Amino acid sequence: MSVLEASEIMQLIPNRYPILFMDRVDELNPGESIVVTKNVTINESFFQGHFPGNPVMPGVLIIEALAQAASILILKSEKFAGKTAYLGAIKDAKFRKIVRPGDVLKLHVQMVKQRSNMGTVSCQAMVGDKAACTTDLTFIVGATDSK
């Protein structure tokens, strides 16, 4: 059973298809941690060009999926309700496993530190029991621009 479904996720973050990379939130401990599921299917638009005959999810999109999961974690706090979380930095990103159609990505994000409207999270994208990607992300929370 999920904590948040896709429609609830879209109420929190501005991302939409084809750049929304999460299907559901499985676990959420506000201000502490989140676990999100992304089912990777052959229908993803990026597989048309990356790579024909050998589909591989681009590493930068795995990072984006982790950043979106981090956004949910951050924006579910009362302090940042109605705001937007922006990616400020990517540190020590490592890609350890190729992600392919049919894989289920489990995105694990843990709050490391937060000060004012900035903070750092530690992230892992898992396929089964193997880490596909690990990284630390820095975020900045700002007003939602309605322009």
UniProtKB/Swiss-Prot annotation:
Belongs to the thioester dehydratase family. FabZ subfamily. It comes from Lactiplantibacillus plantarum (strain ATCC BAA-793 / NCIMB 8826 / WCFS1). The gene is fabZ. Gene3D superfamilies: Hotdog Thioesterase. The active site is at residue 50. It catalyses: a (3R)-hydroxyacyl-[ACP] = a (2E)-enoyl-[ACP] + H2O. NCBIfam families: fabZ, PRK00006.1. One of its GO terms (cellular component) is cytoplasm. Its EC number is 4.2.1.59. Coiled coil: none annotated. This is 3-hydroxyacyl-[acyl-carrier-protein] dehydratase FabZ. It is found in: Cytoplasm.
